């Protein structure tokens, strides 16, 4: 009888522990769902795009960033879409780079095409490197095109380890498209050139990447190839996204490509090179990828 009672006590205790664990998991899931809903419903009006990213491939170190997009126009206006974008990057050797920009977009062709232009100012706070850029973009559900031109504003300045560095002029062109039947992915190709200073050779190269957009986070992998003066490298980027009510559905589409409305992308971030590419004195060293 005593042994039977002990077994009952153990059984009841196990059921209680299991029940409490299940309830704790349910409470945690409900809390996270409610928290995400709160962020999307409340912060989404202020910042339709907000994200935190971690990426590798920058001098074998991890780069962290936070980025937000804030509308300056009525969020329901599809003719005059005005917004500002700000970001802060913490890169190699604790370099802090601040990016501030303003952009204007417009929806065309029954909201199936989004075109825009933007201006940006970049400032590497630690060593006072400064740069500006102008860009244009065209976005649809079947492909995208982006062109950015960068202008170094600061001259030679004393950088890390008292080495002279200079922000470079340059440009990049990017085309992208989702994989067939997978509209929640994006395959992109980017070509870039940075103009060498003081007689140094220009740096040219390209980059391919594949991004998967899940609910609440994105994962991107790619490879950057240079023309020989700088080592090629692979990179991985993980981004936590917030405040977007229109989450991409994961699945296989009935058609390879379909032209649909991109009105939900009015306030997506401007894709550009946010880190300042610099040349070291008497050499060419890319610190800004």
Where are these regions (language model features)?
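Flexible, glycine-rich linker and terminal segments associated
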Residues: 25-43, 153-188, 192-200, 213-220, ...
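Extended interaction regions within the primary functional domain
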Residues: 43-51, 56-59, 75-81, 102-104, ...
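Feature captures outer-membrane beta-barrel proteins of Gram-negative bacteria and organelles
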Residues: 38-39, 62-77, 96-110, 132-149, ...
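Transmembrane beta-strand segments that form the barrel wall of outer-membrane beta-barrel proteins
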Residues: 47-56, 79-91, 113-124, 134, ...
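Classical Sec-dependent N-terminal signal peptides that target proteins to the secretory pathway
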Residues: 2-24
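Solvent-exposed loop/turn segments connecting transmembrane beta-strands
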Residues: 54-64, 88-99, 123-130, 195-204, ...
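Outer-membrane beta-barrel initiation region
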Residues: 25-95, 271-272, 278-289
């Amino acid at each position: 009888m005593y042994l039977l009672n002990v077994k009952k006590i153990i059984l009841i205790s196990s059921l209680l522990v299991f029940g409490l664990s299940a309830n704790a998991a349910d409470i945690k899931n409900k809390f996270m769902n409610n928290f995400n809903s709160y962020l999307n419903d409340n912060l989404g009006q202020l910042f339709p795009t907000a994200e935190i990213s971690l990426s590798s491939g920058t001098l074998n170190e991890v780069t962290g960033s936070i980025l937000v997009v804030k509308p300056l126009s009525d969020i329901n206006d599809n003719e005059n879409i005005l917004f500002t974008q700000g970001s802060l990057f913490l890169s190699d050797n604790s370099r802090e780079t601040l990016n501030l920009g303003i952009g204007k977009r417009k929806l065309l062709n029954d909201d199936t095409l989004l075109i825009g232009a933007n201006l940006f100012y970049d400032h590497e706070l630690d060593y006072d490197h400064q740069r500006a850029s102008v860009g244009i973009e065209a976005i649809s559900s079947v492909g995208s095109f982006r062109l950015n031109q960068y202008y170094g504003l600061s001259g030679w300045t004393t950088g890390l380890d008292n080495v002279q560095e200079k922000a470079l002029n340059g440009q990049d062109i990017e085309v992208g498209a989702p994989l067939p039947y997978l509209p929640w992915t994006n395959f992109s190709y980017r070509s870039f050139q940075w103009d060498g200073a003081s007689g140094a050779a220009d740096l040219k190269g390209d980059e391919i990447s594949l991004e998967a957009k899940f609910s609440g986070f994105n994962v991107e992998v790619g490879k950057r190839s240079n023309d020989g003066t700088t080592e090629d490298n692979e990179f991985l980027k993980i981004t936590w996204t917030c405040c977007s009510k229109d989450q991409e559905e994961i699945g296989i589409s009935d058609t390879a490509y379909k032209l649909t409305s991109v009105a939900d992308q009015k306030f997506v971030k401007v894709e550009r090179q946010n880190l300042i590419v610099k040349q070291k004195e008497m050499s060419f060293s890319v610190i800004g990828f």
